[in-house]
């Protein structure tokens, strides 16, 4: 039984329940980018498939690298947990050096989510992952993306981004 069904069934004269359950419904979106893609320095990883559709508080345009988190809430803020995992490598012809991705909020990479690897050679795949809480004030919006924070173009494959409304 969902929280909404429970609330509606308990509305009797002798039994009242506060409708705080509206905020507790599960809101989640999962988007992926399975194909190998080249991401230039400072650009966002594109997500081409939607595995789990979001709700009106988590919005994504197919093929875009950005999701929009909306602060639709009766509280002071909405809290989202954003998780990313994927494989990265230096493309053929690239320089062997440290490469990195980071979760970016409103265009600014979060340094605490920076995923750094140093391959021994080009085309060596490494798996990276990070997650961060993002607070969105009531009535506002924030954008979230996964950004290439390296100094060169990198190749990304099997990207998976999950956004979950926590509170």
Where do the protein language model's features map onto the residues?
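Extracellular jelly-roll beta-sandwich "head" domains, especially the C-terminal globular C1q domain
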Residues: 4-167
